[in-house]
Swiss-Prot record:
It is found in: Cytoplasm. ATP binds at residues 209, 228, 244-252, 293, 329, 445-446, 451. Keywords: ATP-binding, Cytoplasm, Decarboxylase, Gluconeogenesis, Lyase, Manganese, Metal-binding, Nucleotide-binding. GO terms for biological process: gluconeogenesis. InterPro entries: PEP_carboxykinase_ATP, PEP_carboxykinase_C, PEP_carboxykinase_N, PEPCK_ATP_CS. It catalyses: oxaloacetate + ATP = phosphoenolpyruvate + ADP + CO2. It comes from Actinobacillus pleuropneumoniae serotype 7 (strain AP76). It holds the Pfam family PEPCK_ATP. Substrate binds at R62, Y203, K209, R329. This is Phosphoenolpyruvate carboxykinase (ATP). Monomer. SUPFAM superfamilies: PEP carboxykinase N-terminal domain (SSF68923), PEP carboxykinase-like (SSF53795).
Length: 536
């Protein structure tokens, strides 16, 4: 069996492999990570929870400035390329540079003992991608075993990869300046060869999000919605999806003891319903407590993998310590959460679509009900305030507009995702809501208790019975009272000692929305949506 894999690696340019450790068991991975001779970022440290902790060095988040896609016949007309007018992370790379990076990575992985993990991205058999991850680092193999859908023994026998990720985190590119690249580190994709190359960065999320960018390329072209969201399902089969950027509450709010989790970050929506791309969760752990997030806290045990947390002398973890990064993380297989959809992470069509935003300006209401036009407008706007540390160099809250709540991972033009999502919503008769998990005039973050009360009201339908009023400037319909939610917070103006303060901030934020949306007004469809946005 291994000789076949050796041949397949040789075709990629990885030769003279000393040993192939294919799809190692968790037990085997644990032994590998604990080897005393390991050095640097390869080293795992056992914590009192039973989970292993690793460090990823200076890269404690993704490196979007180092992301490139090969510009060729396959990609040139489909990819949403960066431009001077509208910048994004899809930077073009020529064939010669790709070839040189591929040689660097295959040279690095040749003559080594390698971990090869074969897995699936996507829980639906007809749209999933068979992916092979090749790495020399045990914990990276552990990360992808946690995060992707684990094949059965039988599926492994006839496994043919559709896509290969070659992780050469130990190698950097000495010729980056001459090649016109951003730095010696690189995350590059070739849609024709169906390969991702990683060099210089050890951050686990590059492998996870790399595959997400690919699903975001392939699926919408087939009419399947591809979404940066979490999803869960109630006892009656009612499905909800939660869109939101990092740190807005996707994982926390969808992990709900009353509902079964479909997944916490990446989903597709096809003719049968909503399905997870992944086989695990990648949760932020900064300030994690058992009281606030019991399911995630308890998921941190043997087989979970902690990243960049501070481990005390006695092996316990200080979750409040963000000295390495605010973006501390844990990956764990989805079965570490008790309440999940089994055996396959998928369910029916979503009736409730929730857009999560963490508004650092203290302007947006904790919940509002969106019209179909507002749904498109706020989906394309993708507003939040970036929270500390999910990307390198960001520690203060700053406003960000990220199309479709995931611009960093969009391979096609944002309007394509909006079009496919809204079509799915119309067919299913879904309703969208904008939920602010950020701040208000009190200067404090809206409590997780109130936010959970709001989510409950959306999911059990009681929000539909609530009286609403219109918030000026943004023209959003806000409920005047909801069960188990402090009524004093529902209208953000009431949280300010002086309502004129809200007005000033609201005008400022509205102006930012309007300016950001200008990039979508180059066609009639975009122009028509302007009316759904804030009015100055």
């Amino acid at each position: 069996m291994l000789s076949r894999i050796e041949q397949e690696l040789a075709q990629l340019g990885i030769t003279n492999v000393k040993e192939i450790v294919r799809n190692p068991s968790y037990e085997q991975l644990f032994e590998e990570e604990m080897k005393p001779e390991l050095e640097g970022f390869e080293k795992g440290r056992l914590t009192t929870s039973g989970a292993v902790a690793v460090d990823t060095g200076i890269f404690t988040g993704r490196s979007p400035k180092d992301k490139y896609i090969v510009y060729d016949e396959t990609s040139k007309d489909n990819v949403w390329w960066t431009s001077d007018a509208v910048k994004n992370d899809n930077k073009p790379m020529n064939q010669a540079t790709w070839q040189s990076l591929k040689e660097l990575v295959t040279h690095q992985l040749s003559n080594k003992r390698l971990f090869v993990v074969d897995a699936f991205c996507g829980a639906n058999k007809d749209s999933r991608v068979a992916v092979r991850i090749v790495t020399e680092v045990a914990w990276q193999a552990h990360f992808v075993k946690n995060m992707f859908v684990r094949p059965s023994e039988e599926e492994l026998l006839n496994f043919v990869p559709d896509f290969v990720v070659m992780n050469g985190s130990k190698v950097t590119n000495p010729n980056w300046k001459e090649q016109g690249l951003n730095s010696e580190n690189f995350v590059a994709f070739n849609l024709t060869e169906k390969i991702q190359l990683i060099g210089g960065t050890w951050y686990g999320g590059e492998m996870k999000k790399g595959l997400f960018s690919l699903m975001n390329y392939w699926l919408p072209l087939k009419g399947i919605a591809s979404m940066h969201c979490s999803a869960n399902v109630g006892a009656k089969g009612d499905v909800a999806v939660f869109f939101g950027l990092s740190g807005t509450g996707k994982t926390t709010l969808s992990t709900d003891p009353k509902r079964k989790l479909i997944g916490d970050d990446e989903h597709g929506w096809d003719d049968d319903g909503v399905f997870n791309y992944e086989g695990g969760c990648y949760a932020k752990t900064i300030n994690l407590s058992e009281e606030n997030e019991p399911d995630i806290y308890r998921a941190i045990r043997r087989d979970a993998l902690l990243e960049n947390v501070v481990v005390r002398e006695d092996g316990s973890v200080d979750f409040a310590d963000g000295s390495k990064t605010e973006n501390t993380r844990v990956s764990y297989p989805i079965h570490h959460i008790d309440n999940i959809v089994e055996p396959v992470s998928k369910a029916g069509h979503a009736k409730k679509v929730i857009f999560l935003t963490a508004d650092a300006f203290g302007v947006l209401p904790p919940v509002s009900k969106l019209t179909p036009e507002q749904t498109k407008y706020y989906f394309l706007s993708g507003f939040t305030a970036k929270l500390a540390g999910t990307e390198r160099g960001i520690t203060e809250p700053t406003p960000t507009f990220s199309a479709c709540f995931g611009a960093a991972f969009l391979s096609l033009h944002p309007t394509k995702y909006a079009e496919v999502l809204v079509k799915r919503m119309e067919e299913a008769g879904s309703q969208a809501y904008l939920v602010n998990t950020g701040w208000n005039g009190s200067g404090k973050r809206i409590s997780i208790k109130d936010t959970r009360g709001i989510i409950d009201a959306i999911l059990d339908g009681s929000i539909e019975k609530a009286e609403t009023k219109e918030l000026p400037i943004f023209n959003l319909a806000i409920p005047t009272a909801l069960p188990n939610v402090d009524p004093a917070i529902l209208d953000p103006r009431d949280t300010y000692a002086d309502k004129a303060q809200w007005q000033t901030k609201a005008e400022d934020l509205a102006g930012r929305f309007v300016k950001n949306f200008e990039k979508y007004t180059t066609n009639d469809e975009g122009k028509a949506l302007v009316a759904a946005g804030p009015k100055l």
